[in-house]
């Protein structure tokens, strides 16, 4: 039995929107934690973790290149005794690195170390496979030691089991931020779409009641007296109106329609091909604009709609029908 359901498709849309909004909040909280971590480079133990490094000195120029767009610097991150040293990977002409180099050249870092945020990464040995989400330098330890005098203070106190990556840190930050924004945007879009579906559904019921007073309070007559009624596809042809009630209710007066056809979109997901069916139409007063009616997807939708198209062609000869 058909009933008037003004909130059909509305509540479920809001529930999904709430889910995406909560997910967006979780991703944003991860971004906040990523930006405000307190673990220092000297104490961090896990590759891929965001850390903070205090920089007391830095080489004025890069000591090496990583690929075509990235470079390596050596920095002092501890000033106790002979100090401790490590490598930093960053993009060429990185603004943060330039600021640190400027402070070092002015002699300001020893008394006022620069607090740098980055991702601590363990380098890869040669011929080993990277299984982490982050890009990592191969043969880092051997390369760094090849640059240094093995008896120098820097070489003797150089940390080569880890290095700091600004590139991966910025990439992770951007991913989390854009992810939270995208999810929040999707949630807002779903809320707007849900209210649009409800508004369209209410307008459809009002149009039916206005044109067919006998339906007020008793929509079951749609199914009983319809010339075409398909519960699988959620499609009804009642007198002059074509009605779909999948994901909300939509109605069109076929006397205003110029063309009615089935639009089939073929998609492939995970190697499985499937078809998405939609009824489309154009109006006589707006022949260039295409409107869509949502129907339930069924493999044999084309065959099931032949009867509908035949009835429309017979009763509304001005309407062009097809698939």
Put a short name on every predicted segment.
Residues 261-323:
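Acidic, Ser/Thr- and proline-rich intrinsically disordered linker/docking segments
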Residues 1-42:
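Hydrophobic secretory-pathway targeting helix
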Residues 31-50, 201-211:
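Alpha-helical transmembrane signal-anchor/signal-peptide segments
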Residues 109-166:
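Extended, hydrophilic extramembrane loops/domains of integral membrane proteins
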Residues 193-239:
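Anionic N-terminal interaction surfaces
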Residues 39-125:
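Membrane-proximal low-complexity regions enriched in glycine and acidic/polar residues
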Residues 54-58, 242, 251-267:
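Phosphoinositide-dependent membrane-docking surfaces
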Residues 170-199:
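Selective detector of the "anchor" transmembrane alpha-helix that sits immediately C-terminal
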